[in-house]
């Protein structure tokens, strides 16, 4: 199961992000911010990294491990010979999706234990932040 949080904001300047080499999905800036916010609540996270569907961080805390992803669809600039960059103005309003996946052992999966739920502490925190 996955929990999704969607929102619209211009708070994150994706023009300062490392362009995702797999496709035109931003997410690095929102995950850097989210990782800093989670650290204030005793969660540890890795630096953001690219995935073919966007960006992700690994998060540990409250006795559990999670993969937290983020993405906002943007376009690349179409300039032959130029470096890969997003074709948006700084601080443009974008639709964001954050997804939370909870890591479970094979035994937990077989026994139906430790499932991700809406009331999971990390899900509640991500929605509150």
Regions found by a protein language model. Give the residues of each.
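Short, intrinsically disordered low-complexity segments
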Residues: 35-68
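N-terminal low-complexity, intrinsically disordered segments
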Residues: 1-48
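Short, low-complexity intrinsically disordered segments
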Residues: 31, 51-53, 94
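Long protein-protein interaction modules used by eukaryotic assembly/scaffold proteins
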Residues: 2-21, 58-129
